[in-house]
Amino acid sequence: MVTVEEYRKAQRAEGPATILAIGTSTPSNCVDQSTYPDYYFRITNSEHKTELKEKFKRMCDKSMIKKRYMHLTEEILKENPNMCAYMAPSLDARQDIVVVEVPKLGKRGTQKAIKEWGQPKSKITHLVFCTTSGVDMPACDYQLAKLLPVRPSVKRLMMYQQGCFAGGTVLRLAKDLAENNKGARVLVVCSEITAVTFRGPSESHLDSLVGQALFGDGAAAIIIGSDPIIGVERPLFELVSAAQTLVPDSEGAIDGHLREVGLTFHLLKDVPGLISKNIEKSLLEAFQPLGISDWNSLFWIAHPGGPAILDQVELKLGLKPEKLRATREVLSNYGNMSSACVLFILDEMRKASTKEGLGTTGEGLEWGVLFGFGPGLTVETVVLHSVAA
């Protein structure tokens, strides 16, 4: 008779969880950041708020964003005037949009990831879906499973309302699933649409205005598994370790509340300071076991909550400007897509590394770090190992 120990050992994979494919997608509607203030104040019937518009223009100018993608078009907003008001009841209209569009956007990214992976959908064993855009039952994980479709026996996990750190969370979960289930192939999808957060401007809620200047729509899908099949599956990054922590004395720094008016965000000004003061502790805990203490020897993927966070992290750790190149590139071209951002950055990094002939998927370097920051303040830290490009 087989012992429990023998059975458990046979259930586990041998090698580390590995990213095997990445696919991304955005809505077709592209928004130019330089003209967005004029559009935003016009569509929300707020052109009389001239001083506030000037403030918003400065926010957009400082955002380091060139363009974003948004499902919400002028036509949709004209059909839903309450979404353009500052605090009008509008949750039903928002929900009607996102419960349909979030899985659809996720499907497009997933199809790209599956194509790169090169394996049949029937080999997907687990599905993890993450969004902060709307809530419904059956949830987005179920809707995506039906849209693709995948086998009815695929083991699903739905993550709602986690916010901007969750790109790290899904990698941590997928790592545990892949390493503890031999032969598992985990499809991870983060899909975010700003239809839940869009609203008109208000002088009394400037942190809401910050969100209007930063957030964009996007979905990213990743396939993760241990022990890649040689000659069939192509590894991109290995997930070596993953941790989550709460930043001390940071309660209330970032809050989000889903109410009749949609999802509202509230930010403390010192979010960049709180993150930059505490980030080195997470780095030391993650990299001391590997004997690494030179943060410039790593490749970097950091959630681009906004340029101030990136600037302060860079300054605090003495990072060379090129360390956050991929992160800033994604912020510039897509804005802050919440949980999907770090997965977009992974995709950008491996593509640029190959294009530039840098030797590894991590800009020619062996070890890297992925950071997610969000409500809590919560910090996710994932240690990555690159592979030959």
UniProtKB/Swiss-Prot annotation:
Keywords: Acyltransferase, Flavonoid biosynthesis, Transferase. It catalyses: (E)-4-coumaroyl-CoA + 3 malonyl-CoA + 3 H(+) = 2',4,4',6'-tetrahydroxychalcone + 3 CO2 + 4 CoA. Pathway: Secondary metabolite biosynthesis; flavonoid biosynthesis. Pfam families: Chal_sti_synt_C, Chal_sti_synt_N. The keyword Nucleotidyltransferase does not apply. One of its GO terms (biological process) is polyketide biosynthetic process. The active site is at 164. Signal peptide: none annotated. PROSITE patterns: CHALCONE_SYNTH. Its EC number is 2.3.1.74. GO terms for molecular function: acyltransferase activity, transferring groups other than amino-acyl groups; naringenin-chalcone synthase activity. Belongs to the thiolase-like superfamily. Chalcone/stilbene synthases family. The primary product of this enzyme is 4,2',4',6'-tetrahydroxychalcone (also termed naringenin-chalcone or chalcone) which can under specific conditions spontaneously isomerize into naringenin. This is Chalcone synthase 1. It comes from Solanum lycopersicum. The gene is CHS1.
